């Protein structure tokens, strides 16, 4: 990478408000420490995630460093989460799966996660409520959907690492 990090966790509020104004439901998560990526204490995210700007401002006043949780059900999204952990390279596996199916991910928004993983964002297909699954796809690749959340693209973690964004949201392909 080698690029200079100019974003700070202070930008998370602006990012959360921008996501909310586009109709994506957000909530505050911890941006560092042993519970990084978990919802803030006493935040029942499935109940309280929102697009309400006033509520979002209140949360970030209370927790200015909060990471942004993205409620996938309320946001009508599915995320394919390809990780690199030890032996499992989900990013490579996902690339192979896509080329086997001759599926070109052009225009699919990707978020590069701080641990060299990739989140592929899709809209829920019309009339479906695809949930979370582990193990249906190759090792290192999970699906998060209805009932799940991810750290939102554009989020800066406490250590300065970024969930970097590329592209617009397409409908999920048949895999």
Model-derived regions, located:
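Conserved phosphate/metal-binding and DNA-contacting active-site motifs used
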Residues: 1-175
């Amino acid at each position: 990478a080698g690029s200079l990090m100019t974003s700070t966790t202070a930008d998370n509020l602006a990012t959360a408000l921008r996501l909310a104004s586009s109709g994506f439901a957000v909530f505050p998560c911890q941006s560092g420490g042993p519970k990084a990526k978990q919802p803030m204490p006493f935040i029942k995210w499935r109940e309280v995630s929102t697009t309400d700007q006033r509520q979002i401002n209140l949360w970030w006043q209370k927790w200015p460093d909060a990471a942004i949780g993205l409620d996938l059900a309320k946001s009508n999204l599915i995320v394919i989460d390809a990780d690199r952990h030890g032996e499992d390279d989900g990013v490579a596996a996902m690339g192979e799966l896509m080329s086997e199916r001759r599926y070109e991910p052009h225009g699919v928004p990707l978020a590069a996660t701080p641990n060299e993983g990739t989140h592929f964002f899709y809209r829920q297909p019309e009339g479906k409520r695809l949930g979370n699954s582990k193990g249906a796809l190759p090792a290192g690749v999970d699906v998060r959907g209805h009932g799940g959340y991810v750290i939102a693209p554009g989020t800066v973690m406490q250590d300065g690492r970024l969930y970097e964004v590329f592209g617009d949201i397409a409908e999920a392909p048949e895999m």
